[in-house]
Every structure is written in structure tokens, then in C-alpha cells.
Amino acid sequence: MKEKLALALLSFFLGLGSFFSFYVAPTLFKVLERQQAGAVVEKVFPVYFGLGIILVGISLFLGRDSGKLFLSLGILNLLLLLLQEFIVIPKLHGLKATNYELFLKYHGVSMGINLAILLLTLGKVLILIFKR
């Protein structure tokens, strides 16, 4: 039962992250001015990463008996979410107004970390599916 709940939480987070990252954010930048789209994304993504910390943390606890690979991926996933939420995102906010070139560099790093988070989440989902 615990693993099914972990699977549900991770699947929800994977769907949410994929939807925001690959549909909502790009669409905002297509239909709104860059500043407006950026203002929306600045509000949405910290909530997304914060929710990820909670969901991935709970799933890590619930799936603690799912093997070393699941735990390793879960710990790395959680660390990357914490890095995004508490280091990268605040750094991006500070740089946007002061050094746009450096902001773009950190934005690229942030996108890479987000992709890694989604892939790690997918890996844990697959582990739980095929473990059954």
C-alpha cells in the first residue's frame, strides 16, 4: 500500500512538472510579453519546486523498502529540488534585474536541473511500476 501511494505521489509530480515545464511556461512566453510571462513563471515555479520537495520527500519515506536504487534516485531528486528552491531560484531573482547575461546562464542551469528532476522522478516511477 505504501508503494502505491508513493507511485501516485510521484506520478502526480511528474505529470505536473511535465505540464508546467513543457506546456505552460513555453505557452506563456508565446502569448504574453516577456516581462509578463516571466512574472507569472516567477510565481509558479517556486510553488512547483516546493510541492516537489514535499511529494518527493513523502514518497522517499513511503518507498524506503523499494531498494537501494529507488533510495539513491530519491535522495538525489530531493537534493536537486532543494538546490532549485533555495539556491538557484533566489539567485535567478537577484540576477534578472542586475545582470541579465548571467541570469540567462543560471536559467540554463535551472532548466537542466529541472530536466534531471523530471528524469529522476520518472526513474522512480518506473522502479515502482516494474517492482510489482
Swiss-Prot record:
Task: Quote the cellular component terms of the Gene Ontology held in the record.
Answer: plasma membrane
Species per Swiss-Prot/TrEMBL record: Aquifex aeolicus (strain VF5)
**Lineage start:** Bacteria, Pseudomonadati, Aquificota, Aquificia, Aquificales
List where this protein forms a coiled coil: none
Q: What is this protein called?
A: Uncharacterized protein aq_125
Please tell me whether the keyword Cell membrane is annotated for this protein: yes
Which keywords does UniProt give here? Cell membrane, Membrane, Transmembrane, Transmembrane helix
Q: Where in the cell is it found?
A: Cell membrane
Record keyword Membrane present: yes
